[in-house]
Amino acid sequence: MTPSLANFLWSLVLGAAIVLIPATIGLIFISQYDKIKRT
């Protein structure tokens, strides 16, 4: 594996983490808040 390919893969992994982690936290927070609001 070339260093540039490794850097590209790491940027994909980090990009996915930066997008998915806040999205997951946001969805969990919204679902919890919505459940509380609905009752």
Curated annotation (Swiss-Prot):
A single GO cellular-component term on record: plasma membrane-derived thylakoid membrane
Record's subcellular location: Cellular thylakoid membrane
GO annotation terms (biological process): photosynthesis
Principal place of residence: membrane
Family annotation (InterPro entries): PSII_PsbX (IPR009518), PSII_PsbX_type_1_subfam (IPR023431)
Topology relative to the membrane: Single-pass membrane protein
Source species, domain of life: Bacteria
Keywords: Membrane, Photosynthesis, Photosystem II, Thylakoid, Transmembrane, Transmembrane helix
Residue spans crossing the bilayer: 10-30
Gene3D superfamilies: Single helix bin
Annotated function: Involved in the binding and/or turnover of quinones at the Q(B) site of photosystem II (PSII). PSII is a light-driven water plastoquinone oxidoreductase, using light energy to abstract electrons from H(2)O, generating a proton gradient subsequently used for ATP formation.
Oligomeric form and interacting partners: PSII is composed of 1 copy each of membrane proteins PsbA, PsbB, PsbC, PsbD, PsbE, PsbF, PsbH, PsbI, PsbJ, PsbK, PsbL, PsbM, PsbT, PsbX, PsbY, PsbZ, Psb30/Ycf12, peripheral proteins PsbO, CyanoQ (PsbQ), PsbU, PsbV and a large number of cofactors. It forms dimeric complexes.
Family label: Belongs to the PsbX family. Type 1 subfamily.
This protein's name: Photosystem II reaction center protein X
Annotated organism of origin: Microcystis aeruginosa (strain NIES-843 / IAM M-2473)
